[in-house]
């Protein structure tokens, strides 16, 4: 039997990259999927691909920084069925160092934290009643930078946001365990997604720096995140909560 049969999974950031790959992976394991993304067409494409494969998916546009919009979409999805899996995958990245133009750095700080950290909070809070009712599973997308700041140029706001996602994951796991809700995170390394396509093309030396520090010697693909995401959303991880599964080719071990 598919690992996620009978589950209704909500995936934010489903319009591209890691979120899209996970949405497809969840559907292939039997879950009904609601694909959410600020890019309405991206979310629609993910849902169309799932439905074309014989799965069941719906899609909606969502700006995760809008708390009221998150609550409204949760109410709408409640009519589809109780949500038992929430994958918080919406995220952005900027690469201004702290010593760059002060106004640009401040805007990065506001924008990145609004999406990566506050967005995770907003969506989780909106779906929490349903997740408590179903004794559901929350999977947050963290990062290598949930633990460290990359040696390659990166915004400190991104590092702070992903540290925050890990802290939020652990705090919720401690609080919601009594309700039967499990909360975990995934820590991707350098995964080939649209978010970093420009950096990979224009700064090959940054990619090489990552590879030299990575035992497996390659960058990751969005599909590399799917297995861990299914594991954390399924009964295979029934006694796992408050942890982060690193999917970084071994970068964080050396």
Name what the model sees in each region.
Residues 40-41, 61-72, 224:
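The beta1-alpha1 cofactor-binding region of Rossmann-like NAD(H)/NADP(H)-dependent oxidoreductases
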Residues 135, 177, 182, 240-242:
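Short, small/polar-rich loop/turn modules that mediate ligand/substrate recognition or access, typified
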Residues 229-230, 241-254:
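Short C-terminal tail/terminal secondary-structure segment
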Residues 139-164, 169-178, 191:
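Catalytic loop of short-chain dehydrogenase/reductase
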Residues 93-110, 151-157, 197, 201-202:
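Conserved mid-core segment of classical short-chain dehydrogenase/reductases
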Residues 2-34:
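Canonical Rossmann dinucleotide-binding motif of NAD(H)/NADP(H)-dependent dehydrogenases/reductases
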Residues 129, 174-178, 238:
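Alpha-helical segment proximal to the catalytic Tyr-Lys
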């Amino acid at each position: 039997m598919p690992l996620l049969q009978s589950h209704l999974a909500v995936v934010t950031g489903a319009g591209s990259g890691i979120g899209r790959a996970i949405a497809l992976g969840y559907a292939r394991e039997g879950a009904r999927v609601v694909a959410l993304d600020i890019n309405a067409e991206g979310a629609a494409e993910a849902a169309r691909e799932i439905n074309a494969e014989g799965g069941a998916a719906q899609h909606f546009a969502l700006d995760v920084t809008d708390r009221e919009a998150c609550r409204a979409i949760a109410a709408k999805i409640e009519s589809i069925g109780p949500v038992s899996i929430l994958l918080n995958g919406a995220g952005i990245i900027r690469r201004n160092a702290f010593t760059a133009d002060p106004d640009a750095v401040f805007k990065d700080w506001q924008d990145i934290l609004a999406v990566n950290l506050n967005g995770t909070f907003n969506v989780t809070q909106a779906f929490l009643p349903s997740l408590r009712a179903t004794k559901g599973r929350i999977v947050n997308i963290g990062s290598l930078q949930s633990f460290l700041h990359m040696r390659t140029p990166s915004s400190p706001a991104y590092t702070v946001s992903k540290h925050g996602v890990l802290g939020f994951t652990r705090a919720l796991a401690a609080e919601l365990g009594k309700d039967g809700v499990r909360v975990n995170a995934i820590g991707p390394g350098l995964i080939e997604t649209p978010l970093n396509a420009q950096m990979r093309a224009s700064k090959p030396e940054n990619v090489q720096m990552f590879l030299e520090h990575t035992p497996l010697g390659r960058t990751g693909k969005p599909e590399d995140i799917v297995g861990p995401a299914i594991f954390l959303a399924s009964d295979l991880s029934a006694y796992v909560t408050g942890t982060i599964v690193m999917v970084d080719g071994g970068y964080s071990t050396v």
